[in-house]
Amino acid sequence: MAPGSRTSLLLAFGLLCLPWLQEGSAFPTIPLSRLFDNAMLRAHRLHQLAFDTYQEFEEAYIPKEQKYSFLQNPQTSLCFSESIPTPSNREETQQKSNLELLRISLLLIQSWLEPVQFLRSVFANSLVYGASDSNVYDLLKDLEEGIQTLMGRLEDGSPRTGQIFKQTYSKFDTNSHNDDALLKNYGLLYCFRKDMDKVETFLRIVQCRSVEGSCGF
């Protein structure tokens, strides 16, 4: 292979491995469309993992009558993310600016950086492909960085950084033989699935507004 071709391949490989390269680096500016594609891939993967793990756990451990009583009880089905002001319907969502939706998505992602560790035993026993606490954590961190990069690009061209959002989920007993622990883990999975759905939805809306030809995908 010619030296020039080898250099081009190495550069391309480096860009693929580092999707959130800072704008002021020696590398070419990454197209906005690609930044959104990278963010959407991670958001979709997180949402799918959350949905599949929740469904698997529910079918294995939660009787149908227990599920209905759990979901109908505001005390047990309350997610910590309820404290993060988020639009509750399509109309409210459409009224939010791109930066507002990205900011909300960032807070939702950051609110799960610690709680996913409480689900270590759930992920370890899951048959869902890629469901491990380390893999989920890495996806969350990657998406956190990606959203910060998008916020900077849409605002002033420089990556945004900030304090990690502090959550208040209490540590749960992960003893799988404890009924109370099962319900608490079920509650965490329920909230995780719900929040990842919001993140994917908000990012898709911002992508549609920002990148021509990206709506409907």
UniProtKB/Swiss-Prot annotation:
Family label: Belongs to the somatotropin/prolactin family.
Single annotated GO MF: hormone activity
Keyword Zinc in annotation: yes
One Gene Ontology cellular component annotation held by this UniProt entry: extracellular space
Position of the signal peptide: 1-26
GO biological process, one term: animal organ development
Family annotation (Pfam families): Hormone_1
Protein residues bound to Zn(2+): 44, 200
InterPro entries assigned to the protein according to its UniProt record, in alphabetical order: 4_helix_cytokine-like_core (IPR009079), Somatotropin (IPR034975), Somatotropin/Prolactin (IPR001400), Somatotropin_CS (IPR018116)
Record function comment: Plays an important role in growth control. Its major role in stimulating body growth is to stimulate the liver and other tissues to secrete IGF1. It stimulates both the differentiation and proliferation of myoblasts. It also stimulates amino acid uptake and protein synthesis in muscle and other tissues.
Highest classification ranks of the organism: Eukaryota, Metazoa, Chordata, Craniata, Vertebrata
Superkingdom of this protein's organism: Eukaryota
Keywords, in A-Z order: Disulfide bond, Hormone, Metal-binding, Phosphoprotein, Secreted, Signal, Zinc
This protein's name: Somatotropin
Zinc-finger found in the keyword field: no
Residue positions, PTM Phosphoserine: 132
Gene: GH1
Compartment list: Secreted
Disulfide bond positions: 79-191, 208-215
Source organism of this protein record: Pan troglodytes
